[in-house]
Amino acid sequence: MLLVFDVGNTNIVMGIYKGKKLLHSFRISTEKSKTSDEYGMLINQLFEYNGLKLKDVDAVIISSVVPPIMHTLESMTIKYCNTKPLIVGPGIKTGINIKYDNPKEVGADRIVNAVAAYEIYGGPVIVIDFGTATTFCAISKNCEYLGGIIAPGLAISADALFQRTAKLPKIELTKPSTVICKNTVSSMQSGIIYGHVGMVDYIVSRMKEEFAPNAYVVATGGFARMIAEESKTINTVNDMLTLEGLRIIYERNAD
């Protein structure tokens, strides 16, 4: 079995593959203070709950935007899976030509998403990932990573309002039924969520003007479905895009 890790600033998402089939996926909190043994015990419990054995994992791939966690998980997989993981980074085969000024600056998660989106949907394609940050990536019809945009995510926006104002409360990110709201909490929710929808649609329209009017737009990440319900530019949501990208990259490097 192949175990894939997508390590983000807020969550770690894991997928277990048998061949090309995703058997299970899990989401746990990203905690820098956890040791490799603590992660090993937690992941082992998730496996056992789903009738699986961690020792049956014979391959691992890790994509991480949090370097300390990457090293912790690397130690964990060596000890508990008896296998050295493939790390998404410089030198691995992705099949994508990165046109960034400095290709090493591109986050591993963005590369993984680009690989999956091009493999599944073809190009040109735009990938929007709604995570801690909201990122946009442009991939050409020739499988070139042209660049993109990094914007504050919804949770960051909500936290900023709470932390930088004297009277505004901490809120849950749920979508109000109307844009015009009659209380503070729903007014904040409206501004953050519908404001994000407006940002997404404007940025996508500008991206299409600059590189491909016919680009297909795929969204992923925790808030993707909520934003896609209101967006006029998102064509589809793929919750497992990053996990699929990790599987594809592993297969390209397995030989």
UniProtKB/Swiss-Prot annotation:
Binding site for ATP: 6-13, 132
The protein's role, per its UniProt record: Catalyzes the phosphorylation of pantothenate (Pan), the first step in CoA biosynthesis.
Enzyme's top EC category: transferase
Catalytic residues (positions): 109
Binding site for K(+): 129
EC numbers: 2.7.1.33
Quaternary context: Homodimer.
Protein name, as recorded: Type III pantothenate kinase
NCBIfam families tied to this protein: baf, PRK13318.1-5, PRK13318.1-6, PRK13321.1
Statement: the UniProt record of this protein carries the keyword Cell membrane: no
Cofactor note: A monovalent cation. Ammonium or potassium.
Cofactor dependency: NH4(+); K(+)
Localization: Cytoplasm
Gene3D superfamilies: 3.30.420.40
Chemical reaction(s) catalysed: (R)-pantothenate + ATP = (R)-4'-phosphopantothenate + ADP + H(+)
UniProt KW keywords: ATP-binding, Coenzyme A biosynthesis, Cytoplasm, Kinase, Metal-binding, Nucleotide-binding, Potassium, Transferase
GO molecular function (one): pantothenate kinase activity
Matching Pfam families: Pan_kinase (PF03309)
CC per GO annotation: cytoplasm
Chain sites annotated for binding substrate: 100, 107-110, 184
GO biological process: coenzyme A biosynthetic process
Pathway participation: Cofactor biosynthesis; coenzyme A biosynthesis; CoA from (R)-pantothenate: step 1/5
InterPro entries listed in its UniProt record: ATPase_NBD (IPR043129), Type_III_PanK (IPR004619)
Family: Belongs to the type III pantothenate kinase family.
